[in-house]
């Protein structure tokens, strides 16, 4: 993923209150390129996804450099999925399926912060809300009122996986983590 200009333009449109500098995006891409994708539609780049190894029940700070990824990471953290409104209808779902396979190959859990009241969307994939402690609740506050920390335990979901969502008519790409 190299088109930082398009990524930043999409981020500014989708996440106007969750600003992150271009250098912060670039660092995440450099630290874990396997988790980063531009999402392409008929019109070109219509979205992006950023994910990287992290620790469960912890949230990487917004607009801050990570410097490195934790050696003892126990989850694949979905930092952001953003798709332009006119292009929603499947491209984000394909990215999440890619992350699912990546996490399964390493035995990791998937984690994210659901924003903009998208919790029910993430639940369709298999993510579940997690009870948070005071420290995590304080960090969630900077994401807005509807922010919810969620995990998808892929090992537990193996036997009871919900049906994969996202028919073209569904609004899956409204997922903005």
Language model features by range: what are they?
Residues 48-82, 87, 97, 134-146, ...:
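Conserved acyl-donor/pantetheine-binding loop and adjacent beta-alpha core of acyl/acetyltransferases
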Residues 96, 101-115:
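Conserved GNAT acetyl-CoA-binding A-motif
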Residues 105, 116-142:
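Conserved active-site alpha-helix within GNAT-family acetyltransferase domains
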Residues 34-36, 144-151:
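Short hydrophobic/aromatic beta-strand or adjacent loop that forms the aromatic wall/cage
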Residues 90-91:
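Glycine-rich phosphate-binding loop
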Residues 1-7:
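A short beta-loop-alpha structural element at the N-terminal edge
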Residues 14-46, 50-68:
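Active-site rim helix/loop that mediates acceptor-substrate recognition in acyltransferases
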């Amino acid at each position: 993923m190299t088109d930082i200009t398009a990524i930043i333009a999409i981020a500014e449109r989708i996440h106007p209150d969750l600003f992150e500098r271009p250098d912060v995006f670039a660092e995440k891409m450099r630290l874990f390129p396997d988790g980063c994708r531009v999402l392409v539609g008929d019109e070109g780049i219509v979205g992006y996804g950023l994910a990287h190894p992290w620790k469960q029940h912890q949230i990487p700070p917004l607009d801050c450099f990570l410097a490195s990824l934790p050696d003892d990471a126990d989850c694949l953290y979905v930092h952001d999925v953003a798709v332009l409104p006119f292009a929603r209808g499947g491209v984000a779902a394909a990215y999440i399926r890619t992350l699912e396979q990546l996490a399964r190959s390493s035995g990791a859990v998937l984690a994210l912060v659901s924003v903009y009241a998208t919790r029910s969307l993430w639940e369709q994939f298999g993510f579940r809300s997690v009870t948070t402690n005071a420290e995590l609740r304080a960090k969630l506050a900077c994401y807005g009122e509807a922010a919810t920390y969620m995990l998808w335990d892929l090992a537990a979901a193996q036997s009871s996986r919900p049906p994969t969502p996202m028919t073209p008519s569904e609004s899956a790409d409204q997922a903005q983590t």
